[in-house]
């Protein structure tokens, strides 16, 4: 027979009540998994309890099952875990291994949630820390539950569905230690006149007697209360149920519950005999409530902000509307509002707080890339873009670099969270880095001079700019976390350390950032982990002094084009540029044939594959045609009318000239600067070097392409006819020597052994030296 706990007659103060919800919403559909995880060995008993008869019918099996499951079912195990976690919390509060406190825990199977009610009282808890302790309390409870789940691993490994519940608990525990409860740990609260919520103390014994005790027992969602509760302990008006109850670590048996309730009601918590005023009896001469008091009670308690708070709200709205990020922006755009706020007590501090709130709002809603597009919404990538020109001069594919920058600024490039522009002076590295960060505007800088607080300016920023980066042993460890995008805590001047979330980093330097300097020694121990976190672009070519600065609009145009054309993720970057691994040194660009990186002649636009400039058609139409052939697919330059399409006639007639067997059949191409080529091919490709922008341009492009296609077909037919004529000429029989002689002007004399008659046009021809040599030693006729 179970031990009956003594009736609790005093409860430690102050007392608070908590509610813990089991962080697995589908617990009712998979309750059998909870039996296996928390109460291993009770699965068969729970199945048998489903088929038992309800009270008052006699059922020996039912009574035996209820006795055996008294404190072994999963509700009892959950109740014990919560009690142990509560004891641990109070020991932390009182700094004592054996805290002096009172604890009541009751587990219940609700309609939606599996939850536990906790009443705890004692020194160490107060209105100030009871509410803030919810996350810590939640983490301690989950740790106790996980520890009981691990006991199952001693007998067998987890099933897949059991492992799913276990990992859900582990994830919730990690979030709890980060201060996130997800609404699964709540405390009874009240709202004050200002609308703030505070922890509410309770009368623990009355709360226990009136709310927790009058409930019927139900230890499984498959069974019913009339199966688990005997008729002698049935609460008639109770609609809710409970699973298990612990009072200071001792279980409250089901058969003793009604007795316990009666003892509390009669001996411990008697009702008031007299009213609290005047010694009147109950319901005698109650005070009348006047109209004014009724009117006052119906007045709305909505909080009204004062003048200072209204000014702060207006300034915050202005910052969101006009994208104001620094104090100078406030002075330029809303000086009147700024002056009114400066006139308030502590106005400068209030302005800093408003700007800090706006920075937090921007960092939570935008990434560096999306905020850049938010500030520069409509931009087009032109061929005279200086960012495009600079990357081409340094030997890189500007489209590939833009793709990588989009991934890094959008926090989609994995562990490589940093872009480093390395090179000597006057190569454009600072020009490029400055254009990126000034386009984003909300950026922080690293200060080497303030050695104790190097990253003081990096919190609540979209991007970090590390100009002339130098790695020192004092800050190399936090630098590795920041360069890799790992969350870490940084020291801030005159404040506690703050959490720095993942923030992209832009570096421009001419130092070796992989060599760590410390004192009079240089170490390369950190070189490998630093290289895994950095993408380095080497700028080695010096720029002319007239190159100019890259504007924020130009860098935004390049990144916006890449963001619209490519999949800006790590996987998309690897697939687009055929890379198995992103190296530390960014790969150089490979230009298409005939495409140039010389930005002097850039009117024809840029190639969408290599980023190089298309060459000038006026300089060499042959290369333009070849480049166009690679970019236009099936339409070739010969098909678009580069040649005249006319067959050239031979200089001699068919009688006077016999064509060779291997004669060139195609008509010679027109010269590079011919009018026909300039009108057809070059004009077409100069007009359509980019995609049509709307439906009208698309229809015009299709019309011109169809005309050029028809011209190609007509030219093909002419070439086929020429080929047929030449084939017929080759099939004619070759003339014999006599016929050749007649064609050359020799006529046979008709008299035997007489030389032929030579026409007058050949009479003046003198024999050559070779002919003279043929008659040496012979008598000439």
Swiss-Prot record:
Q: Where in the cell is it found?
A: Host nucleus
Q: From which domain of life does this come?
A: Viruses
**Which ranges carry the PV NS1-Nuc domain?**
11-271
Compositionally biased intervals (Acidic residues): 641-650
Q: Name one GO cellular component term.
A: host cell nucleus
Q: Record-annotated residues binding ATP?
A: 423-430
Locations of Polar residues compositional bias? 621-635
The region called Transactivation is annotated at 606-781
Q: Where is this motif: RCR-3?
A: 211-215
UniProt-annotated catalytic positions:
211 (for nuclease activity)
State the free-text cofactor note: The endonuclease active site can probably bind other divalent cations.
Q: Which intervals of the chain are annotated as region Ori-binding? A: 193-197
Instruction: Cite the SUPFAM superfamilies for this sequence.
Output: P-loop containing nucleoside triphosphate hydrolases
Name the reported effect of residue 536 to H.
Answer: In strain: Eg/BSU-1
The record places domain SF3 helicase at 397-552
Complexes and interactors: Homooligomer; when bound to DNA.
Q: What is this protein called?
A: Initiator protein NS1
Annotated organism of origin = Primate bocaparvovirus 1 (strain Human bocavirus 1 type 1) (HBoV1)
